Protein backbone atom coordinates (compact mmCIF):
# COMPACT_ATOMS: atom_id res chain seq x y z
CA UNK A 1 0.00 0.00 0.00
CA UNK A 2 2.80 2.40 0.92
CA UNK A 3 4.61 1.54 -2.32
CA UNK A 4 1.46 2.36 -4.34
CA UNK A 5 1.08 5.70 -2.54
CA UNK A 6 4.75 6.48 -3.16
CA UNK A 7 4.43 5.58 -6.84
CA UNK A 8 1.34 7.79 -7.22
CA UNK A 9 3.05 10.68 -5.42
CA UNK A 10 6.09 10.36 -7.70
CA UNK A 11 3.87 10.43 -10.78
CA UNK A 12 2.13 13.59 -9.54
CA UNK A 13 5.46 15.31 -8.83
CA UNK A 14 6.87 14.36 -12.24
CA UNK A 15 3.69 15.55 -13.95
CA UNK A 16 3.82 18.94 -12.19
CA UNK A 17 7.49 19.40 -13.09
CA UNK A 18 6.67 18.45 -16.68
CA UNK A 19 3.80 20.95 -16.91
CA UNK A 20 5.70 23.86 -15.32
CA UNK A 21 8.78 23.26 -17.48
CA UNK A 22 6.76 23.23 -20.69
CA UNK A 23 4.81 26.33 -19.69
CA UNK A 24 8.01 28.29 -18.99
CA UNK A 25 9.58 27.03 -22.21
CA UNK A 26 6.50 28.10 -24.17
CA UNK A 27 6.59 31.61 -22.69
CA UNK A 28 10.31 32.03 -23.39
CA UNK A 29 10.19 30.60 -26.91
CA UNK A 30 11.18 33.24 -29.49
CA UNK A 31 8.55 34.08 -32.08
CA UNK A 32 9.28 32.94 -35.63
CA UNK A 33 8.59 35.36 -38.47
CA UNK A 34 8.72 32.68 -41.15
CA UNK A 35 5.57 31.95 -43.11
CA UNK A 36 4.49 28.43 -42.21
CA UNK A 37 1.69 26.55 -43.98
CA UNK A 38 -1.81 27.43 -42.74
CA UNK A 39 -3.40 25.40 -39.99
CA UNK A 40 -5.81 25.41 -37.05
CA UNK A 41 -5.29 27.48 -33.92
CA UNK A 42 -3.06 25.74 -31.38
CA UNK A 43 -3.29 25.54 -27.59
CA UNK A 44 -0.28 26.35 -25.41
CA UNK A 45 1.97 23.35 -24.65
CA UNK A 46 -0.14 20.61 -26.28
CA UNK A 47 -0.66 22.29 -29.65
CA UNK A 48 -3.39 20.38 -31.51
CA UNK A 49 -3.19 17.14 -29.54
CA UNK A 50 -6.66 17.75 -28.11
CA UNK A 51 -8.04 17.34 -31.64
CA UNK A 52 -6.14 14.13 -32.38
CA UNK A 53 -5.73 11.90 -29.34
CA UNK A 54 -8.50 9.35 -28.98
CA UNK A 55 -9.72 10.02 -32.53
CA UNK A 56 -8.98 8.62 -35.98
CA UNK A 57 -6.23 11.05 -37.05
CA UNK A 58 -6.52 10.42 -40.79
CA UNK A 59 -10.19 11.47 -40.67
CA UNK A 60 -9.49 14.49 -38.44
CA UNK A 61 -6.65 15.60 -40.73
CA UNK A 62 -8.85 15.26 -43.82
CA UNK A 63 -11.55 17.44 -42.27
CA UNK A 64 -8.97 20.06 -41.28
CA UNK A 65 -7.28 19.95 -44.70
CA UNK A 66 -10.62 20.55 -46.40
CA UNK A 67 -10.55 23.89 -44.57
CA UNK A 68 -6.83 24.79 -44.58
CA UNK A 69 -5.61 23.19 -47.79
CA UNK A 70 -3.48 20.22 -48.97
CA UNK A 71 -0.37 21.57 -47.21
CA UNK A 72 -1.29 22.16 -43.58
CA UNK A 73 0.62 22.79 -40.36
CA UNK A 74 -0.36 21.53 -36.91
CA UNK A 75 1.50 21.23 -33.62
CA UNK A 76 1.76 17.81 -31.98
CA UNK A 77 3.12 18.81 -28.60
CA UNK A 78 6.47 20.45 -29.36
CA UNK A 79 6.60 18.98 -32.87
CA UNK A 80 5.79 21.10 -35.90
CA UNK A 81 3.96 18.68 -38.18
CA UNK A 82 3.16 19.17 -41.86
CA UNK A 83 0.12 17.32 -43.23
CA UNK A 84 0.04 16.54 -46.97
CA UNK A 85 -3.44 15.68 -48.25
CA UNK A 86 -3.51 15.62 -52.06
CA UNK A 87 -1.81 13.59 -54.79
CA UNK A 88 -0.39 16.75 -56.36
CA UNK A 89 1.10 17.96 -53.08
CA UNK A 90 2.36 14.45 -52.27
CA UNK A 91 4.34 14.50 -55.52
CA UNK A 92 5.81 17.91 -54.68
CA UNK A 93 6.83 16.91 -51.16
CA UNK A 94 7.84 13.26 -51.61
CA UNK A 95 9.32 13.50 -55.12
CA UNK A 96 10.42 17.06 -55.89
CA UNK A 97 11.65 17.58 -52.32
CA UNK A 98 12.18 13.88 -51.63
CA UNK A 99 15.77 14.28 -50.48
CA UNK A 100 14.80 17.04 -48.04
CA UNK A 101 12.27 14.75 -46.32
CA UNK A 102 14.22 11.49 -46.54
CA UNK A 103 14.68 11.07 -42.78
CA UNK A 104 12.40 9.31 -40.32
CA UNK A 105 11.47 11.05 -37.06
CA UNK A 106 13.23 9.81 -33.94
CA UNK A 107 11.00 7.12 -32.49
CA UNK A 108 11.57 5.83 -28.96
CA UNK A 109 9.99 2.46 -29.76
CA UNK A 110 11.99 1.96 -32.96
CA UNK A 111 15.22 2.69 -31.10
CA UNK A 112 14.39 -0.22 -28.81
CA UNK A 113 13.01 -2.83 -31.17
CA UNK A 114 15.11 -1.98 -34.27
CA UNK A 115 18.51 -2.11 -32.59
CA UNK A 116 18.88 1.65 -32.40
CA UNK A 117 17.27 2.35 -35.78
CA UNK A 118 19.01 -0.27 -37.91
CA UNK A 119 17.19 -1.71 -40.94
CA UNK A 120 15.49 0.18 -43.78
CA UNK A 121 12.38 1.34 -41.93
CA UNK A 122 13.87 3.73 -39.38
CA UNK A 123 17.53 4.21 -40.35
CA UNK A 124 18.73 7.78 -40.83
CA UNK A 125 19.08 8.69 -44.48
CA UNK A 126 22.64 8.23 -45.70
CA UNK A 127 25.01 5.74 -47.28
CA UNK A 128 24.00 2.90 -44.92
CA UNK A 129 20.34 3.22 -45.87
CA UNK A 130 21.04 3.55 -49.59
CA UNK A 131 23.20 0.43 -49.62
CA UNK A 132 20.73 -1.52 -47.50
CA UNK A 133 17.81 -0.60 -49.77
CA UNK A 134 19.90 -1.75 -52.72
CA UNK A 135 20.44 -5.09 -50.97
CA UNK A 136 16.68 -5.41 -50.46
CA UNK A 137 15.77 -4.45 -54.03
CA UNK A 138 18.45 -6.44 -55.85
CA UNK A 139 18.82 -9.52 -53.66
CA UNK A 140 16.48 -10.06 -50.71
CA UNK A 141 13.20 -9.01 -52.37
CA UNK A 142 13.96 -8.71 -56.08
CA UNK A 143 11.29 -9.96 -58.54
CA UNK A 144 13.42 -13.01 -59.29
CA UNK A 145 13.86 -13.77 -55.58
CA UNK A 146 10.15 -13.36 -54.84
CA UNK A 147 9.36 -15.73 -57.71
CA UNK A 148 11.79 -18.26 -56.21
CA UNK A 149 9.68 -18.27 -53.02
CA UNK A 150 6.69 -19.76 -54.90
CA UNK A 151 7.28 -23.28 -53.60
CA UNK A 152 7.26 -22.01 -50.01
CA UNK A 153 4.14 -19.89 -50.57
CA UNK A 154 2.29 -22.84 -52.11
CA UNK A 155 3.42 -25.35 -49.49
CA UNK A 156 2.41 -23.10 -46.60
CA UNK A 157 -0.85 -22.33 -48.38
CA UNK A 158 -1.77 -26.02 -48.39
CA UNK A 159 -1.25 -26.12 -44.62
CA UNK A 160 -3.36 -22.96 -44.30
CA UNK A 161 -6.20 -24.45 -46.36
CA UNK A 162 -6.11 -27.74 -44.42
CA UNK A 163 -6.39 -25.76 -41.19
CA UNK A 164 -9.54 -24.03 -42.42
CA UNK A 165 -10.99 -27.26 -43.83
CA UNK A 166 -10.66 -28.85 -40.40
CA UNK A 167 -12.97 -26.13 -39.05
CA UNK A 168 -15.55 -26.00 -41.84
CA UNK A 169 -18.91 -24.90 -40.50
CA UNK A 170 -17.41 -23.21 -37.44
CA UNK A 171 -16.92 -19.45 -36.92
CA UNK A 172 -13.34 -18.22 -37.26
CA UNK A 173 -11.47 -14.91 -37.16
CA UNK A 174 -9.91 -14.78 -40.61
CA UNK A 175 -7.34 -12.17 -39.54
CA UNK A 176 -5.84 -14.59 -37.00
CA UNK A 177 -5.69 -17.38 -39.58
CA UNK A 178 -3.94 -15.05 -42.03
CA UNK A 179 -1.38 -13.93 -39.44
CA UNK A 180 -0.47 -17.56 -38.67
CA UNK A 181 0.07 -18.31 -42.37
CA UNK A 182 2.08 -15.14 -42.94
CA UNK A 183 4.39 -15.63 -39.95
CA UNK A 184 5.10 -19.20 -41.00
CA UNK A 185 5.75 -18.18 -44.61
CA UNK A 186 8.10 -15.30 -43.87
CA UNK A 187 10.02 -17.42 -41.37
CA UNK A 188 10.67 -20.04 -44.03
CA UNK A 189 11.75 -17.63 -46.77
CA UNK A 190 14.03 -15.84 -44.32
CA UNK A 191 15.39 -18.66 -42.19
CA UNK A 192 14.94 -21.77 -44.31
CA UNK A 193 12.97 -24.94 -43.80
CA UNK A 194 14.88 -25.94 -40.68
CA UNK A 195 14.70 -23.46 -37.80
CA UNK A 196 14.29 -24.90 -34.33
CA UNK A 197 13.52 -21.48 -32.84
CA UNK A 198 10.67 -20.57 -35.20
CA UNK A 199 7.81 -20.85 -32.70
CA UNK A 200 9.70 -18.89 -30.04
CA UNK A 201 10.48 -16.18 -32.57
CA UNK A 202 6.86 -15.85 -33.68
CA UNK A 203 5.63 -15.73 -30.08
CA UNK A 204 8.02 -12.87 -29.25
CA UNK A 205 7.06 -10.97 -32.42
CA UNK A 206 3.38 -11.13 -31.48
CA UNK A 207 4.14 -9.70 -28.04
CA UNK A 208 6.31 -6.93 -29.46
CA UNK A 209 3.63 -5.94 -31.98
CA UNK A 210 1.12 -5.68 -29.12
CA UNK A 211 3.28 -3.42 -26.93
CA UNK A 212 4.52 -1.25 -29.80
CA UNK A 213 1.14 -0.69 -31.46
CA UNK A 214 0.47 2.85 -30.14
CA UNK A 215 0.86 5.21 -33.13
CA UNK A 216 2.02 8.15 -31.00
CA UNK A 217 4.34 8.05 -27.99
CA UNK A 218 4.01 11.03 -25.69
CA UNK A 219 7.76 11.13 -25.02
CA UNK A 220 8.45 11.61 -28.75
CA UNK A 221 6.14 14.64 -28.88
CA UNK A 222 7.91 16.44 -26.03
CA UNK A 223 11.63 15.76 -26.60
CA UNK A 224 12.75 18.39 -24.09
CA UNK A 225 11.06 16.40 -21.32
CA UNK A 226 11.58 12.91 -22.69
CA UNK A 227 13.36 11.61 -19.59
CA UNK A 228 10.55 12.55 -17.20
CA UNK A 229 7.70 11.52 -19.51
CA UNK A 230 9.22 8.11 -20.19
CA UNK A 231 9.25 7.46 -16.46
CA UNK A 232 5.51 8.16 -16.23
CA UNK A 233 4.01 6.80 -19.44
CA UNK A 234 6.48 4.58 -21.28
CA UNK A 235 6.18 0.82 -21.84
CA UNK A 236 9.73 0.68 -23.20
CA UNK A 237 10.95 -1.35 -20.22
CA UNK A 238 8.63 -4.18 -21.34
CA UNK A 239 9.90 -3.84 -24.91
CA UNK A 240 13.51 -3.95 -23.72
CA UNK A 241 12.82 -7.22 -21.92
CA UNK A 242 11.20 -8.62 -25.06
CA UNK A 243 14.13 -7.44 -27.17
CA UNK A 244 16.50 -9.32 -24.87
CA UNK A 245 14.44 -12.47 -25.49
CA UNK A 246 14.41 -11.75 -29.22
CA UNK A 247 18.14 -11.13 -29.22
CA UNK A 248 18.84 -14.46 -27.53
CA UNK A 249 16.67 -16.38 -30.00
CA UNK A 250 18.19 -14.70 -33.06
CA UNK A 251 21.72 -15.29 -31.74
CA UNK A 252 20.89 -19.00 -31.61
CA UNK A 253 19.40 -18.94 -35.13
CA UNK A 254 22.46 -17.21 -36.59
CA UNK A 255 24.95 -19.41 -34.70
CA UNK A 256 23.19 -22.61 -35.80
CA UNK A 257 23.34 -21.52 -39.43
CA UNK A 258 26.97 -20.42 -39.26
CA UNK A 259 27.99 -23.72 -37.67
CA UNK A 260 26.18 -25.90 -40.21
CA UNK A 261 26.92 -27.06 -43.74
CA UNK A 262 23.80 -25.17 -44.78
CA UNK A 263 25.71 -21.94 -44.14
CA UNK A 264 27.19 -22.00 -47.63
CA UNK A 265 23.78 -22.00 -49.33
CA UNK A 266 21.94 -18.84 -50.33
CA UNK A 267 18.39 -19.95 -51.05
CA UNK A 268 16.93 -17.97 -48.14
CA UNK A 269 17.43 -14.44 -46.85
CA UNK A 270 19.58 -15.43 -43.88
CA UNK A 271 22.00 -17.17 -46.23
CA UNK A 272 22.28 -14.01 -48.35
CA UNK A 273 22.89 -11.83 -45.30
CA UNK A 274 25.54 -14.18 -43.90
CA UNK A 275 27.28 -14.22 -47.27
CA UNK A 276 27.52 -10.42 -47.12
CA UNK A 277 28.78 -10.61 -43.56
CA UNK A 278 31.51 -13.12 -44.54
CA UNK A 279 32.60 -10.96 -47.46
CA UNK A 280 33.14 -8.12 -44.95
CA UNK A 281 32.05 -5.57 -47.51
CA UNK A 282 34.76 -6.47 -50.05
CA UNK A 283 32.31 -6.11 -52.92
CA UNK A 284 30.05 -3.53 -51.34
CA UNK A 285 30.08 -0.35 -49.28
CA UNK A 286 27.70 -2.10 -46.89
CA UNK A 287 29.29 -3.93 -43.98
CA UNK A 288 26.82 -6.22 -42.26
CA UNK A 289 27.10 -7.31 -38.64
CA UNK A 290 25.00 -9.75 -36.63
CA UNK A 291 23.13 -6.77 -35.21
CA UNK A 292 22.17 -5.65 -38.73
CA UNK A 293 21.03 -9.17 -39.58
CA UNK A 294 18.85 -9.34 -36.48
CA UNK A 295 17.29 -5.93 -37.21
CA UNK A 296 16.51 -6.95 -40.80
CA UNK A 297 14.97 -10.28 -39.77
CA UNK A 298 12.80 -8.61 -37.18
CA UNK A 299 11.55 -5.75 -39.34
CA UNK A 300 10.68 -8.16 -42.15
CA UNK A 301 8.82 -10.44 -39.73
CA UNK A 302 6.61 -7.55 -38.63
CA UNK A 303 6.24 -5.75 -41.96
CA UNK A 304 5.49 -8.85 -44.03
CA UNK A 305 2.91 -10.15 -41.57
CA UNK A 306 0.70 -7.59 -39.85
CA UNK A 307 0.34 -5.06 -42.67
CA UNK A 308 -0.45 -7.83 -45.18
CA UNK A 309 -3.02 -9.38 -42.82
CA UNK A 310 -4.61 -5.93 -42.49
CA UNK A 311 -5.06 -5.40 -46.23
CA UNK A 312 -6.28 -8.98 -46.76
CA UNK A 313 -9.01 -8.52 -44.14
CA UNK A 314 -10.12 -5.20 -45.66
CA UNK A 315 -10.21 -6.74 -49.15
CA UNK A 316 -12.29 -9.67 -47.90
CA UNK A 317 -14.77 -7.48 -46.08
CA UNK A 318 -15.33 -5.24 -49.12
CA UNK A 319 -15.73 -8.20 -51.48
CA UNK A 320 -18.19 -9.89 -49.12
CA UNK A 321 -20.20 -6.66 -48.78
CA UNK A 322 -20.75 -6.55 -52.55
CA UNK A 323 -22.44 -9.75 -53.85
CA UNK A 324 -21.87 -8.93 -57.54
CA UNK A 325 -18.17 -8.40 -56.89
CA UNK A 326 -18.04 -11.63 -54.88
CA UNK A 327 -19.55 -13.61 -57.75
CA UNK A 328 -17.02 -12.21 -60.23
CA UNK A 329 -14.14 -13.04 -57.88
CA UNK A 330 -15.43 -16.59 -57.40
CA UNK A 331 -15.93 -17.10 -61.14
CA UNK A 332 -12.48 -15.77 -62.04
CA UNK A 333 -10.52 -17.64 -59.38
CA UNK A 334 -12.33 -20.94 -59.89
CA UNK A 335 -11.88 -20.76 -63.64
CA UNK A 336 -8.18 -19.90 -63.40
CA UNK A 337 -7.37 -22.81 -61.07
CA UNK A 338 -10.06 -25.24 -62.23
CA UNK A 339 -9.20 -28.82 -61.27
CA UNK A 340 -6.11 -27.81 -59.26
CA UNK A 341 -5.60 -28.80 -55.64
CA UNK A 342 -3.90 -25.54 -54.71
CA UNK A 343 -3.10 -22.02 -55.88
CA UNK A 344 -0.02 -21.71 -58.08
CA UNK A 345 2.03 -18.55 -58.46
CA UNK A 346 2.34 -19.00 -62.22
CA UNK A 347 -1.42 -18.47 -62.55
CA UNK A 348 -1.81 -15.50 -60.19
CA UNK A 349 -1.24 -13.16 -63.12
CA UNK A 350 -4.49 -14.39 -64.68
CA UNK A 351 -6.54 -12.93 -61.83
CA UNK A 352 -7.15 -9.49 -63.34
CA UNK A 353 -10.37 -8.84 -61.43
CA UNK A 354 -8.90 -9.90 -58.07
CA UNK A 355 -6.00 -7.50 -58.71
CA UNK A 356 -8.54 -4.76 -59.37
CA UNK A 357 -10.35 -5.58 -56.12
CA UNK A 358 -7.06 -5.46 -54.22
CA UNK A 359 -6.16 -2.06 -55.67
CA UNK A 360 -9.59 -0.69 -54.86
CA UNK A 361 -9.41 -2.03 -51.31
CA UNK A 362 -5.99 -0.46 -50.64
CA UNK A 363 -7.30 2.83 -52.06
CA UNK A 364 -10.09 2.86 -49.48
CA UNK A 365 -8.35 1.05 -46.62
CA UNK A 366 -4.56 1.43 -46.64
CA UNK A 367 -2.74 -0.46 -43.88
CA UNK A 368 -1.00 2.83 -42.98
CA UNK A 369 -3.44 5.70 -43.69
CA UNK A 370 -0.77 8.32 -42.91
CA UNK A 371 2.04 6.29 -44.51
CA UNK A 372 5.26 6.19 -42.49
CA UNK A 373 6.20 9.67 -41.21
CA UNK A 374 9.09 11.64 -42.68
CA UNK A 375 11.27 14.32 -41.11
CA UNK A 376 12.69 17.40 -42.85
CA UNK A 377 16.49 17.13 -43.03
CA UNK A 378 16.74 20.79 -43.98
CA UNK A 379 14.57 23.87 -44.28
CA UNK A 380 12.88 24.32 -47.66
CA UNK A 381 9.95 26.15 -49.24
CA UNK A 382 6.79 25.06 -51.04
CA UNK A 383 4.50 27.64 -52.65
CA UNK A 384 6.00 30.39 -50.47
CA UNK A 385 5.57 28.44 -47.23
CA UNK A 386 8.54 27.45 -45.09
CA UNK A 387 8.92 23.82 -44.04
CA UNK A 388 11.23 24.03 -40.99
CA UNK A 389 14.15 21.69 -40.52
CA UNK A 390 13.22 18.92 -38.09
CA UNK A 391 9.48 19.17 -38.73
CA UNK A 392 7.52 15.97 -39.17
CA UNK A 393 5.82 15.32 -42.51
CA UNK A 394 2.73 13.10 -42.65
CA UNK A 395 1.13 12.13 -45.95
CA UNK A 396 -2.57 11.51 -45.45
CA UNK A 397 -2.90 8.87 -48.13
CA UNK A 398 -6.34 8.00 -46.79
CA UNK A 399 -7.48 11.48 -47.88
CA UNK A 400 -5.78 11.09 -51.28
CA UNK A 401 -7.60 7.81 -51.83
CA UNK A 402 -10.96 9.51 -51.20
CA UNK A 403 -10.34 12.69 -53.18
CA UNK A 404 -13.39 13.28 -55.45
CA UNK A 405 -11.21 15.28 -57.85
CA UNK A 406 -9.38 12.04 -58.67
CA UNK A 407 -11.86 9.29 -57.86
CA UNK A 408 -15.55 9.60 -58.94
CA UNK A 409 -17.81 8.49 -56.07
CA UNK A 410 -14.72 8.06 -53.89
CA UNK A 411 -16.42 6.35 -50.94
CA UNK A 412 -17.81 3.54 -53.09
CA UNK A 413 -16.01 0.22 -53.56
CA UNK A 414 -15.83 -0.09 -57.33
CA UNK A 415 -13.04 -2.33 -58.72
CA UNK A 416 -14.14 -1.49 -62.27
CA UNK A 417 -12.48 1.93 -61.95
CA UNK A 418 -9.16 0.10 -62.47
CA UNK A 419 -10.18 -1.80 -65.59
CA UNK A 420 -7.97 -0.75 -68.53
CA UNK A 421 -6.09 1.56 -66.14
CA UNK A 422 -2.31 1.77 -65.97
CA UNK A 423 -2.36 3.00 -62.34
CA UNK A 424 -0.14 0.81 -60.15
CA UNK A 425 0.96 0.89 -56.51
CA UNK A 426 4.71 0.99 -57.08
CA UNK A 427 5.18 4.68 -56.29
CA UNK A 428 4.93 6.39 -59.68
CA UNK A 429 1.22 7.18 -59.49
CA UNK A 430 0.73 9.46 -56.51
CA UNK A 431 -3.01 8.89 -56.44
CA UNK A 432 -2.27 5.27 -55.39
CA UNK A 433 0.68 5.03 -52.98
CA UNK A 434 -0.52 2.78 -50.13
CA UNK A 435 3.03 1.45 -49.73
CA UNK A 436 4.80 4.80 -49.92
CA UNK A 437 7.10 6.13 -52.61
CA UNK A 438 10.57 7.45 -53.31
CA UNK A 439 13.63 7.11 -51.10
CA UNK A 440 11.59 5.79 -48.16
CA UNK A 441 9.01 3.76 -50.07
CA UNK A 442 8.52 0.14 -49.04
CA UNK A 443 11.20 -2.02 -50.75
CA UNK A 444 9.03 -5.12 -50.29
CA UNK A 445 5.95 -4.01 -52.25
CA UNK A 446 6.07 -6.95 -54.68
CA UNK A 447 6.57 -9.45 -51.85
CA UNK A 448 3.65 -8.07 -49.85
CA UNK A 449 1.28 -7.93 -52.82
CA UNK A 450 2.22 -11.50 -53.79
CA UNK A 451 1.53 -12.76 -50.26
CA UNK A 452 -1.84 -10.99 -50.19
CA UNK A 453 -2.95 -12.31 -53.59
CA UNK A 454 -1.98 -15.89 -52.70
CA UNK A 455 -4.13 -15.63 -49.57
CA UNK A 456 -7.14 -14.02 -51.25
CA UNK A 457 -7.06 -16.44 -54.18
CA UNK A 458 -6.95 -19.45 -51.82
CA UNK A 459 -9.73 -18.13 -49.59
CA UNK A 460 -12.11 -17.60 -52.52
CA UNK A 461 -11.06 -20.68 -54.52
CA UNK A 462 -11.47 -23.31 -51.81
CA UNK A 463 -14.31 -21.84 -49.75
CA UNK A 464 -17.64 -20.10 -49.72
CA UNK A 465 -18.04 -17.74 -46.77
CA UNK A 466 -20.95 -16.85 -44.53
CA UNK A 467 -20.93 -14.13 -41.89
CA UNK A 468 -21.14 -15.51 -38.35
CA UNK A 469 -23.98 -14.48 -36.05
CA UNK A 470 -26.56 -14.41 -38.82
CA UNK A 471 -25.69 -10.87 -39.91
CA UNK A 472 -26.07 -9.73 -43.50
CA UNK A 473 -23.30 -8.11 -45.59
CA UNK A 474 -25.00 -4.73 -45.12
CA UNK A 475 -24.72 -5.13 -41.33
CA UNK A 476 -20.94 -5.62 -41.19
CA UNK A 477 -19.44 -3.19 -38.69
CA UNK A 478 -16.89 -1.10 -40.63
CA UNK A 479 -15.70 0.85 -37.58
CA UNK A 480 -11.92 1.42 -37.66
CA UNK A 481 -9.33 1.28 -34.91
CA UNK A 482 -6.09 3.23 -35.38
CA UNK A 483 -2.92 1.68 -33.99
CA UNK A 484 0.24 0.50 -35.73
CA UNK A 485 -2.10 0.25 -38.73
CA UNK A 486 -5.79 0.82 -39.32
CA UNK A 487 -7.89 -2.29 -38.74
CA UNK A 488 -11.49 -3.31 -38.15
CA UNK A 489 -12.59 -2.70 -34.58
CA UNK A 490 -14.49 -5.99 -34.68
CA UNK A 491 -12.48 -8.56 -36.67
CA UNK A 492 -14.21 -10.30 -39.53
CA UNK A 493 -15.90 -13.41 -38.11
CA UNK A 494 -16.72 -15.91 -40.85
CA UNK A 495 -18.00 -19.45 -41.30
CA UNK A 496 -16.32 -21.37 -44.15
CA UNK A 497 -17.99 -23.93 -46.35
CA UNK A 498 -16.16 -26.06 -48.91
CA UNK A 499 -16.65 -24.75 -52.42
CA UNK A 500 -18.50 -27.08 -54.78
CA UNK A 501 -15.42 -27.49 -56.99
UniProtKB/Swiss-Prot annotation:
Give the record's pathway: Alkaloid biosynthesis
A Pfam family recorded for this sequence = p450
Q: Where does heme bind?
A: 442
User: What are the record keywords, sorted?
Assistant: Alkaloid metabolism, Glycoprotein, Heme, Iron, Membrane, Metal-binding, Monooxygenase, Oxidoreductase, Transmembrane, Transmembrane helix
Reactions catalysed, semicolon-separated, are: (19E)-geissoschizine + reduced [NADPH--hemoprotein reductase] + O2 = rhazimal + oxidized [NADPH--hemoprotein reductase] + 2 H2O + H(+); (19E)-geissoschizine + reduced [NADPH--hemoprotein reductase] + O2 = akuammicine + formate + oxidized [NADPH--hemoprotein reductase] + H2O + H(+)
Name its co-factor(s): heme
Where in the sequence does glycosylation occur per the annotation? 282
The Swiss-Prot or TrEMBL record annotates one GO molecular function as: monooxygenase activity
Q: Which GO terms describe its biological process?
A: indole alkaloid biosynthetic process
Q: Matching InterPro entries, A to Z?
A: Cyt_P450 (IPR001128), Cyt_P450_CS (IPR017972), Cyt_P450_E_grp-I (IPR002401), Cyt_P450_sf (IPR036396)
Q: Transmembrane region positions?
A: 4-24
Thermal profile, per the record? Optimum temperature is 32-37 degrees Celsius.
EC category:
oxidoreductase
The places in or outside the cell where this protein is found are: Membrane
Q: What is the effect of changing residue 372 to A/V/Y?
A: Strongly reduced activity
Q: Could you tell me how activity relates to pH for this protein?
A: Optimum pH is 7-8.
Stored PROSITE patterns: CYTOCHROME_P450
Gene Ontology cellular-component terms listed: membrane
Q: Might you give the EC number(s) for this enzyme?
A: 1.14.14.187, 1.14.19.80
* Record Gene3D superfamilies: Cytochrome P450
Topology relative to the lipid bilayer, per the entry, is: Single-pass membrane protein
Q: Which PANTHER family match?
A: CYTOCHROME P450 71D11-LIKE (PTHR47955:SF8), CYTOCHROME P450 FAMILY 71 PROTEIN (PTHR47955)
Family label:
Belongs to the cytochrome P450 family.
Its recorded name reads Rhazimal synthase
Give the originating organism. Answer: Alstonia scholaris
